[in-house]
Structure formats: structure tokens, C-alpha cells
Amino acid sequence: MKIYLRFVWILIIILNFLLNLFITTNGVIIVNAFKKSLIVAASFASLSLFNSATAELVYKPLEQPVEPAKPDLKIESVNEKFAEKYPNQYNSWRSTANGDGENIIYADEENPRLIVLWGGYAFAKEYNAPRGHFYAVTDVRNILRTGAPKTANDGPQAMACWTCKGPDVPRLIAEWGEKDYFNAKWAKGGPEIVNSIGCADCHDTTSKDFAEGKPALRIARPHVLRALDALEKATAEKDKAEGRPHNNLSFNTAARTEKRAEICANCHVEYYFAGDIKQVTFPWDNGQTADDIEKYYDDIGFTDWTHSLSKAPMLKAQHPDFEIWSLGMHGKNGVTCVDCHMPKVQGADGKVYTDHQIQNPFDAFDHTCANCHDQSKEKLRDIVTSRKKEVKDVMGRLEDQVVKSHFEAKAAWDAGATKEEMEAALMDIRHAQWRWDYTAASHGGHMHAPEVVLRVLASGLDKVADARTKLAVILTKHGVKTPVQIPDISTADKAWKVMGIDIEKERKAKEEFLKTVVPQWEQQAREKGLLVDPPAQK
């Protein structure tokens, strides 16, 4: 039925174009009458099929548990304090500052369409390719998205924006409790969160096991433990219903293989800021697929922002790496993040240790891929490169179509379209861009689960086709000539101008913030003993 109606709409558009092109002025009355009848027919068709999608989103936040302060929970957040006892691990961790991570890749300048896709949202100001763990705190300070706050209660972002950036976060949650941690502005964390992603993010560094050289894996962020419990419930029910074997996913009772992957789910996941206190929450109650998470957001009426052009109620994916990995062949076969990105290697002292320079598996091929695959490095690299190209090609086509849909929706609003007319098309835009972002925001999805990524992108193309078909009917009804002209967004500067972003103003404010505010934060942190200089390299 859906395909049939899409065909009907396309036929209506073609007939309308031909009528405008070939009928003489003597036939204007007939043409207008025929056009009106076509539009009425299309409107009835859309109402019959898409009534369920036209309900206005009303946010109904799910009540989340809030952990109180736990003063007895000790978390040592200063990474340098473990350098002497674990030099191989520490020095390899510091190496995440080297190589490709030294250079910032300005993704929005390489692909200006991103600026339009995130119109009205802070990501439109600046979006960079990810760097090594060593830079987590530096990069969140430097990015234009976090603004230029002057006081602890100033600035555009919530405290939650720190939550993945380092071991000072679980330390603060333990000291303050979740409510006092989340219910604040980002700037409040400036003097406190100064150590980048490191030891205590993954290990119980105060435990006897850790002192004896054992991994002592621990998740100290309460919201992550809750999310894994919710995921365990959702997947256990699905696996039982479909007769599949099930692995326990609740961290504290999970097997070692699951724990080694779930540690990375501290951060490499999709999440949103829930309720008035902007509490970090993982939308896993239904499962981890793009459809599961979309349904979760739609059911509670959650919206990250309203798009500045289309007025669509948008969702912003974060980095659903754990989700996509778990859906792919590596995840299904128990090959974890650690196996590929943190292999066992031998140090200069002859000791075997886990390499903490999180890196591309091809950079340590003999210790990673070659453990399972008998193909050559060149052969496997060619396969991965080919998959990446396939994903990028489809992703680019979806980007292009969604960008056009935003401008077409704006043209419809400008021509007098009503909220009732637009709701279904805007939901399709929401769902199309969500599918694009779910795949685009994933680091290495083309490797972790290319078949999953391509399937999600294909469904995104279906959604944006639905949106543009409905918009074409609305535009025709309101007398807008199609195709709608898209402004020149061929460079980042042109795209920022089209989207009304004064990028130089943003950059100047950030520069002043980095010169005046950040040094104060670091001085306060040093006075508290939270920030220390790294040991001299031997």
C-alpha cells in the first residue's frame, strides 16, 4: 500500500508538471480545477496511510533513579599516579596523543552539509573527527559547541557534556550524587574535570586485585549500570521469544567477555539528556537497533532540538559504537573492542601487557586481525576499504536528500503550509536523519557491522523519499514551483552564512574563554591536587 501511494503521489507531481507545461492560457480554469482535485485526492491518501505518524510529539520524560552521594566510594582520578607501578600501560595510554590524533580534522569543513543537517543545534558550529583519549578534556573545552562561559552558572551546555571525558566524572558523582552532578551547567565542572579518559574509567584502581596487577574491571557511572540492566531485560525477552541463546549483559553478573566490551559502553554509546536535570540516559529499554531506539524516543516524545529550517523535531545520535558492534558478526562471535583495539603485546622489559594505545587494528595487525584471520593484511585492508566506500557512498546520497528535504520544508512553511499539513512529512525527516546520524556518528560502523549500517541507511532513504513526496504535494498545493532552489553550501563558510551562524563571533568568544577562564580552572585543579605533571619519560 505504501509503495502504491508513493507511486500515486509521484504520478500526480508529473501530471501537474505536464499540465503547467503544455496547457495554454485558455485552459487555466480546467487546469486549476484538475490540480485541485489531484491535491485533494493526495491529501485523503496521506491521511488514510499516515494518520498514526501525525500525532504531535509531547515529551513525557521517564522518571530515572538518582543515586545519592557515596562518600565511601573512592575513585583515584589522577592517571599519573599509576605511571610508576604500570609503566607499560601508562606510556601506551599517553601514546594516544601521537600519530593521527595530533591533528584535528574539521569534519564540518570537509562536509558542509553537516552544518545544514544540524541547523539550529550546537553541532552546526563545529564538529570534528574523534581523536585519542588523551585529548578528551582538551577537545571538549576547545570545541565551539560548549560556548564561552564566564562563571560556573553560565554557558549553553549542561554538566552532562563532561560525562564521557574522564575519571573525574565518576569521582564527582560519588562525591556529589547524581542529582547535584547533572543538575548544573557545564562550566561548573571546569575546575574539577581535568584528567582525560584513563585508568579509573575502566578499573577499580583502589582494589586489591588492581594492586596485584589484575584488570579489576569496574563501571563506576551509575547510569551505565542501569542501562546495561535494562538492556539485559530487553534482550533476554527477545532471545527467549525467538529461541536464541542469551548472554547475561548486567555488568556485575556478566561473564568476562561481556565485561570487556561493556567497559567501552561507558562512553561509546547512544544516550540523551533526560528530564529537567539533563541526566545522561541510554535509550535501551527496547533494545539497541536504530528502530528500537527510535521507538523509545517516539514513545516518550523526546526531541533533541527543532530544526531551524524545516521545524522538524530532530534527534541527534551520539556515537552508537557498542550498539552497532553488538549487532555485527564480531559482536555476535564474542570478539570484543579490547581484542581488536587493545591487543596483548610484549614490552621492552619482556613483559606481556595490554596495549592502551587505543588504535586502528591494522596498526597492530599481527596481534589483532591475524589472531583469527588467515588472509593477508593487504587483502583484509582492501575488503575494509571497499566496505567503507560502499557505506560512504550511500551515506552521502542520504545526506543530500535530507538536506533537500529541510529546504523544501522551509519553502512549504514560507508559502503558508499549516502545522497539520506538515506533521507527517516532518516526522519522516526526523526518522530519515536519525538513521543517517545513527550510522554517521558511529566510529567504524563500516567495519563493525557493514550489513547493519547499509540496511539502516537504506531505510533512511525510504524515509526521506516519503518526506519529499509529501512535501511535493504540499508545495504544489501552495503554488510553489519545484524543484526548490537550494542555496550554495559548497563550503563551510557559505553554509554557516546560509544557516545564520556568525562563526567569527563564536571563534573570538572561544579564544577569549581559553585565554582567561581555562587557566583559572587548571590553577584551581592544581591547588586541589587533581592535576599533576606527567612523570619524565625514561
Curated annotation (Swiss-Prot):
Pathway stated in the Swiss-Prot or TrEMBL entry: Nitrogen metabolism; nitrate reduction (assimilation)
Entry EC no(s): 1.7.2.2
Record-listed heme c 3 binding positions: 133, 264, 267-268
Binding, heme: 161, 164-165
Highest taxon of source: Bacteria
GO MF terms, alphabetically ordered: calcium ion binding; heme binding; iron ion binding; nitrite reductase (cytochrome, ammonia-forming) activity
GO cellular component, one term: outer membrane-bounded periplasmic space
Annotated signal sequence range: 1-55
Cofactors that this protein relies on: Ca(2+); heme c
Gene Ontology biological process terms from the UniProt entry: anaerobic electron transport chain; nitrate assimilation
Xref: InterPro entries: Cyt_c552, Cyt_c_NO2Rdtase_formate-dep, Multihaem_cyt_sf
The keyword Metal-binding appears for this protein: yes
Record field: catalytic activity: 6 Fe(III)-[cytochrome c] + NH4(+) + 2 H2O = 6 Fe(II)-[cytochrome c] + nitrite + 8 H(+)
Binding site for heme c 2: 199, 202-203, 356
Positions with a binding annotation for Ca(2+): 270-271, 316, 318
Primary enzyme class: oxidoreductase
Positions with a binding annotation for substrate: 271, 319
Keywords: Calcium, Electron transport, Heme, Iron, Metal-binding, Oxidoreductase, Periplasm, Signal, Transport
Cofactor details (free text): Binds 1 Ca(2+) ion per monomer.
Main location as per UniProt: periplasm
Alphabetized Gene3D superfamilies for the sequence: Butyryl-CoA Dehydrogenase, subunit A, domain 3, Flavocytochrome C3, Chain A
A Pfam family this chain is assigned to: Cytochrom_C552
UniProt similarity note: Belongs to the cytochrome c-552 family.
Protein function: Catalyzes the reduction of nitrite to ammonia, consuming six electrons in the process.
PANTHER family associated with the record: CYTOCHROME C-552 (PTHR30633:SF0), CYTOCHROME C-552 RESPIRATORY NITRITE REDUCTASE (PTHR30633)
Protein name: Cytochrome c-552
Organism of provenance: Haemophilus influenzae (strain 86-028NP)
